[in-house]
């Protein structure tokens, strides 16, 4: 399988920069703490983790979309840009809002619905969003390198699945636009 290196690099850079900066909001608002902080309270590996999660997660989304028979229609660049901005706002809000975990859950769930209908709105996308909302928090729950400081269940706060539900359609649909469509043979166009 051949993946456009430029698309993969864009997704990696987006994750390594944007999501690391957003994660630093969680560090500075004492939403989470790293076991071995390196710079500004974050671990040295955070940009690598965020970059890999965004790039490999985006490619996995494209593969799953194709395998599940998702429709070929792509979101517009404007819709994707708006979804990414709203995702960043929701991520920041999850650390900055001085409210209960339940209120954060409600706000993030509403944000996830807006993002989902902005760039997707399909059954395939709903299944993938649910997969992201389940798998993301599990990955955080088993990562010993940091702790959420107000966990509700399995080392994570109750609003974390809703945050992943915000991120999944925005990054997944961006990846579909950047990576391209798989050919029938399972190969990616390299142009």
Locate the predicted segments by residue:
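Aromatic-rich, lipid-facing transmembrane alpha helices and their immediate juxtamembrane interface loops
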Residues: 1-191
């Amino acid at each position: 399988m051949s993946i456009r290196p430029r698309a993969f690099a864009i997704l990696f850079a987006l994750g390594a920069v944007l999501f690391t900066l957003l994660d630093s909001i969680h560090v500075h608002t004492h939403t989470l703490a790293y076991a071995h902080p390196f710079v500004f309270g974050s671990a040295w590996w955070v940009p690598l983790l965020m970059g890999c999660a965004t790039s490999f997660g985006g490619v996995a989304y494209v593969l799953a979309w194709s395998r599940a028979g998702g429709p070929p229609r792509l979101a517009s660049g404007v819709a994707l840009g708006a979804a990414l901005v709203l995702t960043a706002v929701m991520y920041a809000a999850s650390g900055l809002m001085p409210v209960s975990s339940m209120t954060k859950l409600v706000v993030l769930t509403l944000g996830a619905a807006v993002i989902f209908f902005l760039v997707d709105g399909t059954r395939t996308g709903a299944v993938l969003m649910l997969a992201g909302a389940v798998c993301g928090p599990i990955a955080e729950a088993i990562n010993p390198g940091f702790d959420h400081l107000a966990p509700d269940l399995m080392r994570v706060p109750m609003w974390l699945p809703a945050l992943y539900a915000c991120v999944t359609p925005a990054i997944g649909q961006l990846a579909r636009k950047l990576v391209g469509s798989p050919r029938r043979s399972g190969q990616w166009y390299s142009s």
